[in-house]
Amino acid sequence: MLGARVAAHLDALGPLVPYVPPPLLPSMFYVGLFFVNVLILYYAFLMEYIVLNVGLVFLPEDMDQALVDLGVLSDPGSGLYDADSELDVFDAYLE
């Protein structure tokens, strides 16, 4: 057979291009980058879940007083918005 003789002759010559193993480091870099991105997405959705579902439970009723307790505002009167004064006006209007 002619094909078998040609194949044997080419095998005897050896490879025409020397074998170069594929670089392992860049591929492992991209695998690591993928897992880092997965972790970032996991923690982003976890924080979103905590803020939207758990954090709303712990919001105080009086935000001005909460800011005073934290030391952000010096006194409750320095708040930007006072809802109690508007309720007093509406109560007087209804009576």
UniProtKB/Swiss-Prot annotation:
Induction: By dexamethasone.
Pfam name, any one: Dexa_ind
InterPro entries given in the database record: Dexamethasone-induced
Tissues/organs with expression: Highest levels in heart. Also expressed in brain, liver, pancreas, placenta and lung. Up-regulated in emphysematous lung compared to normal lung.
PANTHER family: DEXAMETHASONE-INDUCED PROTEIN
Record family assignment: Belongs to the DEXI family.
The protein, known as: Dexamethasone-induced protein
Classification of source organism: Eukaryota, Metazoa, Chordata, Craniata, Vertebrata
